[in-house]
Amino acid sequence: MSLRQRLAQLVGRLQDPQKVARFQRLCGVEAPPRRSADRREDEKAEAPLAGDPRLRGRQPGAPGGPQPPGSDRNQCPAKPDGGGAPNGVRNGLAAELGPASPRRAGALRRNSLTGEEGQLARVSNWPLYCLFCFGTELGNELFYILFFPFWIWNLDPLVGRRLVVIWVLVMYLGQCTKDIIRWPRPASPPVVKLEVFYNSEYSMPSTHAMSGTAIPISMVLLTYGRWQYPLIYGLILIPCWCSLVCLSRIYMGMHSILDIIAGFLYTILILAVFYPFVDLIDNFNQTHKYAPFIIIGLHLALGIFSFTLDTWSTSRGDTAEILGSGAGIACGSHVTYNMGLVLDPSLDTLPLAGPPITVTLFGKAILRILIGMVFVLIIRDVMKKITIPLACKIFNIPCDDIRKARQHMEVELPYRYITYGMVGFSITFFVPYIFFFIGIS
């Protein structure tokens, strides 16, 4: 057998959805009973989507064949009295299947753009379920919108900015690679889909795995030598964070083993090539006279390019959101630097020592997070309400159905880019200015 054939066999084994289902069963996740009748109903509901390239290769009723993202969802497990029950359990809420049965769990989040809801599942190991729910949230918007501001407002603005640069680069390349390779999510059945929020995206590579690899490695690279702490702490953090995020994606039924390995190795390659330029990029963003114009134009061009790679999916909006956030944070840091609101410590003060934890320090940190997040969320909601109707009006797109309107590039790109650009700008300029004004900077 040639090397190419062996590699093809290895790829096939690592991509096998049965391995994902086996891992789920090992962790106490099983599909509820009475799947066959409900599967036929789902196939009828999904028939109009047969033209989507993410749905090609599916044979209706074939339980083990290649199937697209989103198949076999909205299952109706049996009630204790034998009657069917609609899928009404969401966001990790649990109900009882019966007196002696394991509890059931629904999808973490409903996909607001596609209307998808994850199928219910029998979960017998709830500590693992909670752990992997936490792990998968380490790659979602809620985590990012808390994590990056916390670094910038409370810990180290320089590290926070450079983490964002790396995150934008890694996530952009990962999202574009997905739309070029176009591999579907693991087939369901046999896999149980516990999460469907990203189910309309392609699978290879896992951008959760990429983010879960890039962030902890970059944190250690950026902070070790700048801050005083034992290196062993960082060497413990990296595998714990990375493995938790990666395994959570298999547990949720969203990725094959191959997707995870590819995402991890792809991130290592990106960091090896681009990490030496992070310092140069950050300095350019802060100090160059025309940096804001170049930042906005470059990120917008990258967003337009990514929108041409494939038909509509939620990944296009996510890409625009990532690019908008990165552009806003970079532009905000430029303005903040030139106004002298936030100054990085001089090199002769390094390595920095952590300040003693006092009630005053802790109180200021909490106050900064509360005030800052309230302001950021207000900005996000206001920009949402402005940009979608405005884009619809400019491009003559009906906005009666917001979900359909957002599937047009002319609406989704400016909405996400402008909204999250303002969010990023608020994080690095408006909010620090408020802190300076009220005396908690």
Swiss-Prot record:
Gene Ontology molecular function, alphabetical: dihydrosphingosine-1-phosphate phosphatase activity; sphingosine-1-phosphate phosphatase activity
Annotated source species: Homo sapiens (Human)
UniProt keyword terms in alphabetical order: Cell membrane, Endoplasmic reticulum, Hydrolase, Lipid metabolism, Membrane, Phosphoprotein, Transmembrane, Transmembrane helix
Sequence segments annotated as region (Phosphatase sequence motif III): 248-259
Effect on the protein upon substituting H208A: Abolishes phosphatase activity
Protein name: Sphingosine-1-phosphate phosphatase 1
A Pfam family reported for this protein in Swiss-Prot or TrEMBL: PAP2
Annotated compartments: Endoplasmic reticulum membrane; Cell membrane
